């Protein structure tokens, strides 16, 4: 598994998630886009069901550790526990983001406040910096003070008995398919995933794209006519007016 330098992570944290998506797959005809996925047919970024609870933290980037939570099963429960999840977090390259797919009956899905201050503090002890989940969690104010990012399907105050169903398997959360070890980049706009070995190219191309956009924005903000706006966008991601 690719282990990235601290410098790469530092650069990734300077870049917003939409720019990362632009480079990963959004604009396949742009030479700066790596085209890692078909942008419409593959599930590589999250949808509107995921809410960022602490946008003030800025971009959060880490290696994915995955697990599935659901109702206790008398034929299986007890084989895995949250301690096994912590072991998986500890074994992964750092930093990590825990990606939890919650599988509950419909009547419970919006009421399972899975993680709270105790779980999050335990996760942080083994190098985890954020959690992404399709279901709710809780202890929002306490976790705000920990500078740990929550990307969730919602918030609720309680839960009943829960069980770990699997660890480090492919999961689907908020419309995004995630495999263990993939890199997750997330901020108030949502989350995107990509293979970790592409990170240096993602950083390089994202920086170039931001520089290009900054140059174009200067021209656009000075523009007074549609022709001037069109000229500023020439060669960029947006389609030019047909002759």
Residue ranges, per PLM feature:
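General beta-strand structural signal in soluble alpha/beta enzymes
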Residues: 33-36, 69, 99-101, 131-135, ...
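Intrinsically disordered, low-complexity regions enriched in acidic/Ser/Thr/Pro/Gln residues
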Residues: 1-92, 97, 212, 217-226, ...
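Extracellular/luminal Protease-associated
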Residues: 87-134
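Acidic, glycine-rich flexible loop/linker segments
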Residues: 153-229
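Buried hydrophobic positions in well-ordered alpha/beta secondary-structure cores of metabolic enzymes
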Residues: 24, 123, 182-184
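Ligand/cofactor pocket segment of small-molecule handling proteins
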Residues: 120-157
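Short coil/turn connectors at secondary-structure junctions
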Residues: 61-63, 93-96, 127-129, 145-148, ...
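Generic structural signal for well-ordered, non-membrane alpha-helical segments
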Residues: 13-21, 60, 112, 116, ...
């Amino acid at each position: 598994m690719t282990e990235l330098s601290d410098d790469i992570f530092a650069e990734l944290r300077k870049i917003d998630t939409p720019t990362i998506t632009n480079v990963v797959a959004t604009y396949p005809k742009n030479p700066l886009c790596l085209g890692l996925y078909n942008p419409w047919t593959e599930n590589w970024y999250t949808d509107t069901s995921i809410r960022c609870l602490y946008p003030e933290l800025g971009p959060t980037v880490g290696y994915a550790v995955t697990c599935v939570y659901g109702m206790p099963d008398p034929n299986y429960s007890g084989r895995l526990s949250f301690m096994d999840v912590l072991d998986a977090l500890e074994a992964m390259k750092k930093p990590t983001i825990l990606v939890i797919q919650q599988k509950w009956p419909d009547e419970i899905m919006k009421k399972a406040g899975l993680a709270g201050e105790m779980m999050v503090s335990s996760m942080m002890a083994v190098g985890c910096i954020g959690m992404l989940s399709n279901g709710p969690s809780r202890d929002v104010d306490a976790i705000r003070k920990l500078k740990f990012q929550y990307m969730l399907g919602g918030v609720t105050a309680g839960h009943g008995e829960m069980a770990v169903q699997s660890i480090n398997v492919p999961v689907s959360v908020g419309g995004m398919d995630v495999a263990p070890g993939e890199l997750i980049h997330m901020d108030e706009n949502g989350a995107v995933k990509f293979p970790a070995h592409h990170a240096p190219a993602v950083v390089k191309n994202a920086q170039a794209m931001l520089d290009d956009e900054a140059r174009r924005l200067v021209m656009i903000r000075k523009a007074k006519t549609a022709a001037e706006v069109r000229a500023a966008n020439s060669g960029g991601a947006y389609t030019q007016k047909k002759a």
